[in-house]
Amino acid sequence: MHLNTLSPAPGSHKARKRCGRGIGSGIGKTGGRGHKGQKSRSGGSVRPGFEGGQMPLKQRLPKFGFTSRKSLVRAEVRLHELNLITGDVVDIHALKDAGLITRNIVAVKVMLSGEITRPITLRGIAVTKGAQAAIEAAGGKVEE
């Protein structure tokens, strides 16, 4: 057996359809585009959301809500996610290094979800009452 003699099993690779290469191909002449019209022309199509001049759905519906600016710099971390951090001291830099929060986050709060399996020290991170109790029950502590 040599590299130049290798070939796929018969029938395992279907040949691709060659568009517009004669009527025998099954998709010759118009090449699957139908007859005439804007979408049959080269470069001819309408932008996403265009409804032929009718007022588009996006503009017919009212605006609502907004994005809180606080949500862009604050994050929540679940208690069981702290198990992913290797060190004993957990601060914002450790969370960023572990990939649990993005780099633009400046404030973090730990929520009670799951369980912590080892003692850790939280530094400069807010916690809920339940999460604090769970951390202290595991032998850890929370520092402000």
Swiss-Prot record:
The identity of this protein, by name, is: Large ribosomal subunit protein uL15
| One Gene Ontology term from the biological process aspect of the record | translation
- GO terms under cellular component: cytosolic large ribosomal subunit
Biased composition of type Gly residues is found at: 21-31
One MF term in GO for this entry? rRNA binding
Q: Alphabetically list the UniProt keywords.
A: Ribonucleoprotein, Ribosomal protein, RNA-binding, rRNA-binding
Oligomeric form and interacting partners: Part of the 50S ribosomal subunit.
One Pfam family from the record: Ribosomal_L27A
Species in which this protein is naturally found: Colwellia psychrerythraea (strain 34H / ATCC BAA-681)
Q: Hey, which family's this protein in?
A: Belongs to the universal ribosomal protein uL15 family.
Question: What's its job?
Answer: Binds to the 23S rRNA.
Using the UniProt annotation, give all residue ranges assigned to the region (Disordered): 1-58
Keyword Ribosomal protein carried by entry: yes
